[in-house]
Amino acid sequence: MTQAPDREKALELAMAQIEKSYGKGSVMRLGDEMRQPISVIPTGSIALDVALGIGGLPRGRVVEIYGPESSGKTTVALHAVANAQAAGGVAAFIDAEHALDPEYAKKLGVDTDSLLVSQPDTGEQALEIADMLIRSGALDILVIDSVAALVPRAELEGEMGDSHVGLQARLMSQALRKMTGALNNSGTTAIFINQLREKIGVMFGSPETTTGGKALKFYASVRMDVRRIETLKDGTNAVGNRTRVKIVKNKVSPPFKQAEFDILYGRGISREGSLIDMGVDQGFIRKSGSWFTYEGEQLGQGKENARTFLMENDEVANEIEKKIKEKLGIGAVVTDDLSDDGVLPAPVDF
């Protein structure tokens, strides 16, 4: 057996040769490099940021958002885009469904003038454009809406009744193999919005599955299941939806946490509604009957009135948000620049 000093010398020579061939940093001891906190992009809902465990969507990773129709998938993605832009980032939207509403996006806070938008003809074109944008290194967030609309060229050029089994799954698998390393190097967050389908003949367990094969399930660091659970009403008028998001996969924090928040029609995720819910849960806002009180000051009777008060008094809303984040230890790092607020815990890879 080779003596320990000889083995160490052989290892050093091998590492030197690898670095000479592939560049400095191509191989290293994990202990030699200080672990960097995971930079995040806030989602727009403090409840969802808490459920994700790190204060938002991780940068440099693949994120999948899926759920039934009109459940709020695109709204969640657009809020992340707005937050990335607010921090000075560059955002791109691959609109494969050709259904992006610029006016709605603007109401959610998206800077539509600077948003890069592509409406590709084929799935290959969409993913090639996405890959080129990611490799530019200039992008902070990329949204692909949706995986189901990424139609392979062969299917588009074929006849209506032709069978094209597995084409889309192979396309997604190849694209994700190429993209994953580039995403990590550039720090770009790629959000894939996906639709649900039902498997035929399933007797036990959920028959629901997502489109595009299994590759996205493996490559995604975060998978979020978005569901509409209740219609919000003001009197008899429907004004929005109560939405539940379950984190079904999370490689950067413990998974299977849930978050609930309000999505208001024409306005998106209600930041104030999330602050009221989390404020009550964490003991900063007192609820007595239907009245909400913060530090002796009445916010209003009923959630709608309390929501209106916080919308009109932004400094109170910011104060509540700051206290919640400080107590739960989230939101310290939201860009690539390290702050003095503290270091996030090391990621847990499940």
Curated annotation (Swiss-Prot):
Q: Name one Pfam family in it.
A: RecA
Alphabetized GO MF terms = ATP binding; ATP hydrolysis activity; ATP-dependent DNA damage sensor activity; damaged DNA binding; single-stranded DNA binding
Q: Which UniProt keywords apply?
A: ATP-binding, Cytoplasm, DNA damage, DNA recombination, DNA repair, DNA-binding, Nucleotide-binding, SOS response
Which coarse location class describes where this protein primarily resides? Answer: cytoplasm
Q: Where does ATP bind?
A: 67-74
PROSITE patterns hit by this protein: RECA_1, RECA_2, RECA_3
Show the coiled coil region(s): none
Subcellular location(s) of the protein? Cytoplasm
The terms describing its cellular component in GO are: cytosol
Secretion signal: which residues? none
User: What protein family does this chain belong to?
Assistant: Belongs to the RecA family.
Name the PANTHER family for this protein. Answer: MITOCHONDRIAL DNA REPAIR PROTEIN RECA HOMOLOG-RELATED (PTHR45900:SF1), RECA (PTHR45900)
Q: What is this protein called?
A: Protein RecA
Per the UniProt record, the source organism is Mycolicibacterium paratuberculosis (strain ATCC BAA-968 / K-10)
The major lineage groups are:
Bacteria, Bacillati, Actinomycetota, Actinomycetes, Mycobacteriales
